[in-house]
UniProtKB/Swiss-Prot annotation:
The active site is at residue 371. InterPro entries: Bifunctional_GlmU, GlmU-like, GlmU_C_LbH, MobA-like_NTP_Trfase, Nucleotide-diphossugar_trans, Trimer_LpxA-like_sf. This is Bifunctional protein GlmU. Its EC number is 2.7.7.23, 2.3.1.157. It comes from Kineococcus radiotolerans (strain ATCC BAA-149 / DSM 14245 / SRS30216). GO terms for molecular function: glucosamine-1-phosphate N-acetyltransferase activity; magnesium ion binding; UDP-N-acetylglucosamine diphosphorylase activity. Keywords: Acyltransferase, Cell shape, Cell wall biogenesis/degradation, Cytoplasm, Magnesium, Metal-binding, Multifunctional enzyme, Nucleotidyltransferase, Peptidoglycan synthesis, Repeat, Transferase.
Length: 491
């Protein structure tokens, strides 16, 4: 049966638990999955239903969680759970943060269920409204229901839910489980919660007790069965986190492949939830794309590259590169074995080559830093070339300074640029030049001292070494002298 979407009056996300099985100083709901904290996934799904009110319930390290959510969820209401334990008490605390006259559908979900979708929450709200239910519970049939509350039924429908720790042997055999996600009629929820006690093995206020109370009062309790069990899976420990992360990544990769992206080896590719890829992008094996990375059409990334918050232009090639907070222009080439640090901006058709590190540097259109160089705190104009083994010396131990290189510049290998310094348009430099002063446009910079050859130095200073023996042979050959055949050659 197709149900029409319904806008909930409120969505409550429960995120107050300590998560002791994670064995972590970080609150469980802040552990990342696919580039977002667990609770971030839950809040995005909740926000996707367009509720009138969105509430998150916090307790453990509440200030830390609140701070982490402030940027992406500035309008979410935060309710703090007191020392009374249990999901029922958490929902009571959320209701206290909402208008007293709230009416309509209230959805309740959890901050550690990252794959639950907005579409499923909308289906739940729609089924709840269409059935005129007081409570609608989201359920699933699991081959192994261990750890989940069991859904109890009779011939008339759902009669209640029993937590595993309180279940009888007969009830433990039930495979239909409670997802912990509900739709409630607001008034019925308020009234029933006020009558829930703590007479159970854990001494907690169970939200599940509301179902039997509502049913006893004549309210309609129904279930919406979910076929995709991954959507209801929660995170209690690191093993479950890894399982859910792998499934989330598999779904992300499939979504991009169906959208026209080539992913050569899904088994070695990880793409965060907020990454954007255009059609005809190619992702080679061993690639990780994190944060808000954007890759434009026709670009090739990989193999063996990790990009975080990097923008890659159309037709660019980025191979065996580690980059963060950088921009790679259209048709540009990066790598192999390049390191793009924050603030790197490579222009169209430019090149950052093998064993090159860049930081806070702008490299203009068509300019190249082909190999074995460090470019930090620099601006390089268009169509310039930086020779191999060049170092932009930007730090004097106290302050950092900037180097500016103009257009159509040709700099020699093994140059050092001691900032602050400017190299004018069309300038050249010789190999091994240390540039300490500005170079005028069109000038050749060269400051290498004349070469001196100290003849006979090796024979005089390193006698008996293989180098001395080789030098002696060369000298003998050049003068026509026949070397002694019984001379011992050092190994």
């Amino acid at each position: 049966m197709t149900t029409q979407p319904a806008v909930p009056a409120a969505v409550i996300v429960l995120a107050a638990g300590e998560g002791t099985r994670m064995r972590s100083a970080t609150p469980k709901v802040l552990h990342p999955l696919g580039g977002r904290p667990l609770v971030g996934h839950a809040l995005r799904a909740a926000r996707g239903t367009a509720p009138e009110h969105l509430v998150v319930v916090l307790r453990h390290q509440a200030d830390r969680v609140r701070e982490a959510l402030a940027g992406d969820f500035p309008s979410v209401l935060v309710a703090l759970q007191d020392d009374v334990p249990g999901t029922g008490r958490a929902v009571q605390c959320a209701l206290e943060a909402l208008p007293a006259d709230l009416s309509g559908t209230v959805l309740v979900t959890y901050g550690d269920v990252p794959l639950l979708s907005s579409a499923t929450l909308q289906r739940l709200a729609g089924a709840h409204a269409a059935g005129g239910n007081a409570v609608t519970v989201l359920t699933a049939l699991l081959a192994d229901p261990t750890g989940y509350g069991r859904v109890l039924r009779d011939g008339t429908g759902v009669t209640g839910i029993v937590e595993q720790k309180d279940a009888t042997a007969e009830q433990l055999a039930v495979r239909e489980v409670n997802s912990g996600v509900y739709a409630f009629e607001a008034a019925a929820l308020r009234e029933s919660l006020g009558r829930v006690g703590r007479d159970n093995a854990a001494g907690e206020v169970y939200l599940t007790d509301v179902l039997s109370l509502v049913r006893a009062a004549g309210g309609r309790v129904e279930a919406l069965a979910l076929e995709d069990e991954w959507e209801i899976r929660g995170v209690n420990d690191r093993a479950q986190l890894a399982d859910l992360a792998a499934e989330a990544n598999r779904r992300t990769l499939r979504r991009w492949m169906l959208a026209g992206v080539t992913i050569a080896d899904p088994a070695t590719t990880w793409i965060d939830a907020d990454v954007e890829l255009a059609p005809d992008v190619t992702i080679r094996p061993g690639v990780q794309l994190h944060g808000t990375t954007r890759v434009a059409t026709g670009a090739v990334v990989g193999p063996d590259s990790t990009l975080t918050d990097v923008e890659v232009g159309a037709g660019a090639l980025v191979e065996r590169t580690h980059g963060s907070s950088a921009v790679v222009g259209e048709g540009a080439q990066v790598g192999p074995f390049a390191f793009l640090r924050p603030g790197t901006r490579l222009g169209a058709e430019g090149k950052i080559g093998t064993f090159v590190e860049t930081k806070n540097a702008t490299i203009g259109r068509g300019s190249k830093v082909p190999h074995l160089s460090y470019v930090g705190d620099a601006t390089i104009g268009e169509h310039s070339n930086i020779g191999a083994a060049s170092v932009f010396v930007n730090y004097d131990g106290v302050n950092k300074a900037r180097t500016t290189v103009g257009d159509h510049v040709r700099m020699g290998s093994d140059n050092m640029y001691v900032a602050p310094v400017t190299v004018g348009d069309g300038a050249y430099s010789g190999a091994g030049t240390v540039i300490r002063k500005d170079v005028p446009a069109g000038a050749l910079a060269i400051n290498v001292a004349p070469q001196r050859n100290l003849e006979g130095w090796t024979l005089a200073k390193r006698p008996g070494t293989p180098a001395a023996e080789a030098a002696q042979r060369a000298n003998d050959e050049s003068t026509g002298t026949t070397a002694s055949t019984d001379r011992e050659i050092q190994p």
